[in-house]
């Protein structure tokens, strides 16, 4: 048997078939295995996700800080609201006592009565001053355009000399605390006069800003 016969025999055919099968399996395996992702792209995606998460967390913390500051401010400003509202009844009684004394009585009062009147007036001023130090301010609506946010109309007064719907009388004083109405002023408003001017009216808080 020659060398060519040996090379081309059954063994050679089997070897070639095995090699072909191995190559086929390797090729199929390579096709089935997914391509590996780029690690740099993975890091970029992870970095973007972490950045978005950080920005959301920072925004939530900022909102929480602002909300907490607002709640603390409101708590300080309005914590005395209940007590102040009770003190308004005392202030009302002092004012009624002073209003019950006619100008003639004041003018002819003896020393004892004059001292008593002065004491009541001083007490009223001291109370209003103490309330104002805690953010409670008395409204002065006479001459202002009626504002349902701050005033409660009790009656109308026919008066053609002042603009219609102008506050001309105060029955019970109104008060604010901070930017809220603690108690609206009970007022009488003018009726029958000209319409109020469209010009911008002064806010009840202008005195505070002045």
Curated annotation (Swiss-Prot):
Stretches for region Disordered: 1-40, 191-210
GO biological process: protein folding
Keyword Chaperone recorded: yes
InterPro entries per record: GrpE, GrpE_coiled_coil, GrpE_head
GO cellular component: cytoplasm
Annotated GO MF terms: adenyl-nucleotide exchange factor activity; protein homodimerization activity; protein-folding chaperone binding; unfolded protein binding
Assembly: Homodimer.
Name under which the protein is recorded: Protein GrpE
Organism in which the protein naturally occurs: Rhizobium johnstonii (strain DSM 114642 / LMG 32736 / 3841)
Phylogenetic placement of the source organism: Bacteria, Pseudomonadati, Pseudomonadota, Alphaproteobacteria, Hyphomicrobiales
């Amino acid at each position: 048997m020659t060398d060519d016969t040996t090379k081309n025999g059954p063994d050679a055919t089997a070897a070639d078939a095995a090699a072909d099968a191995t190559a086929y399996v390797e090729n199929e395996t390579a096709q089935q295995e997914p391509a590996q992702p780029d690690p740099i792209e993975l890091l970029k995606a992870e970095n973007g996700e972490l950045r978005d998460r950080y920005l959301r967390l920072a925004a939530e913390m900022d909102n929480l800080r602002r909300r907490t500051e607002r709640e603390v401010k409101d708590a300080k400003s309005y914590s005395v609201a209940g007590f102040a509202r009770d003190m308004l009844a005392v202030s009302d009684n002092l004012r009624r006592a002073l209003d019950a004394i006619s100008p003639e009585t004041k003018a002819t009062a003896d020393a004892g009565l004059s001292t008593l009147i002065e004491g009541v007036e001083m007490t009223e001023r001291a109370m209003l001053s103490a309330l104002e130090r805690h953010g409670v301010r008395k409204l002065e609506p006479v001459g202002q355009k009626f504002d349902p946010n701050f005033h409660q109309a009790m009656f109308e007064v026919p008066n053609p000399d002042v603009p219609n719907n102008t506050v001309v009388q105060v029955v019970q004083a109104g008060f604010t605390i901070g930017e809220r109405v603690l108690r609206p002023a009970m007022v009488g408003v003018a009726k029958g006069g000209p319409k109020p001017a469209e010009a911008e009216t002064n806010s009840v808080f202008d005195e505070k800003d002045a």
